[in-house]
Regions:
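Extended ligand-binding regions for polar small-molecule ligands
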Residues: 35-81, 125-134, 200-222, 268-270
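C-terminal motif of bacterial Sec signal peptides marking the signal peptidase cleavage site
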Residues: 19-22
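Extracytoplasmic small-molecule ligand-binding "clamshell" domains
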Residues: 51-78, 88-89, 94-169, 240-243, ...
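Conserved functional loop/turn residues at catalytic and ligand-binding sites
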Residues: 157, 214, 258
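Bacterial N-terminal signal peptides that target proteins for export
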Residues: 1-10
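Bilobed "Venus flytrap"/periplasmic-binding protein-like clamshell domains
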Residues: 105-111, 117-133, 165-166, 191-251, ...
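A residue-level marker of the well-folded mature domains of exported/periplasmic proteins
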Residues: 40, 78, 174-176, 241
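Acidic, polar ligand-binding/catalytic clefts
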Residues: 27-37, 45, 94, 125, ...
Length: 274
């Protein structure tokens, strides 16, 4: 009987170990405790703006010549982008009118787009620079929020919403909740996961082990929305603190031991672990 109980206890312990392993994943020097959700990045334009045609064509050329692949390796260590490729995409467009192109970017979405001192950087920023160089356009930047992308586009403040942007046509609904198809969107070009991350050398391996601790997240509404979607998890923490600087600031604080966990982007995790 004692032997049977001992075997049962051993099996239970093994089951718990496998359960813990299933709910967390070690990536480099970090551990992903839980994935809170996934999203897809897109580029948005005013509906009918010819800029969308030129930018899409330039992106196809940059995918064909390896520029996008090189940028993906630089920022993420791997290329999971899904841009269409066509080396001749610009040939059929004839002469391209010269212009200043204003990029509306989210400066809280490292490493897609972020403020680095007085300049902007990131995968999307460098890709936009490559696009404008190919088109002969002058590129300017304007910080916007993901939530206000449609307003910024329709008002003419920006020519595109590009830089860690998660967009769909519901973002252009009017006050009566009726769709107003006033945005032209590219196909999704990169998937991102919102993840609950701890240091790999910490004692935290499950959401349960984080009870009463402090979790940091960026000021963009995306992060709080992902955390709040799991009400039980949100209440689990002693404090949920927002910090400016997005995932970059969160990873720096986590590495410095200023918090137990962070809510951050899988693209940022890829940046810090490749």
């Amino acid at each position: 009987m004692k032997h049977t109980k001992r075997i049962a206890a051993l099996l239970l312990a093994l089951a718990l170990c496998f359960s813990c392993a299933a709910c967390s994943k070690t990536v480099g020097s970090y551990r992903v405790v839980k994935t809170l959700g996934t999203e897809q990045f897109r580029i948005g334009f005013r509906d009918g703006d010819q800029a969308a045609v030129y930018v899409n064509a330039a992106l196809k050329v940059l995918a064909a010549d390896g520029t996008i692949h090189s940028l993906a390796l630089k920022w993420f260590g791997t290329d999971n982008t899904t841009f269409d490729s066509d080396a001749n995409a610009l040939d059929a467009l004839g002469d391209i009118p010269q212009r200043t192109f204003i990029m509306g970017l989210n400066e809280e979405r490292f490493p897609m787009s972020y403020a680095d001192g007085d300049v902007y950087s990131g995968f999307d920023v460098e890709l936009a620079q490559a696009v404008c160089a190919r088109l002969g356009w002058t590129l300017q930047y304007q910080p916007i929020s993901n939530q206000n992308a449609y307003v910024e586009l329709s008002s003419g403040n920006v020519d595109c919403a590009w830089g860690g942007m998660v967009l769909d046509q519901t973002d252009s609904k009017d006050s009566k909740n009726k769709k107003k198809q006033k945005m032209t969107l590219t196909a999704p070009y990169l998937e991102n996961a919102l993840q609950l991350i701890v240091r790999g050398d910490s004692k935290y391996r499950t959401t349960g082990s984080l009870k009463g601790t402090t979790v940091l997240l960026g000021t963009d509404e995306t992060y709080m929305a992902a955390l709040s979607a799991d009400e039980k998890l949100l209440k689990h923490f002693g404090a949920a603190q927002r910090v400016t600087g997005g995932s970059k600031a969160c990873f720096e604080a986590l590495s410095a031991g200023e918090c137990a966990a962070i809510v951050a982007d899988s693209t940022a995790l890829a940046y810090y672990t490749h």
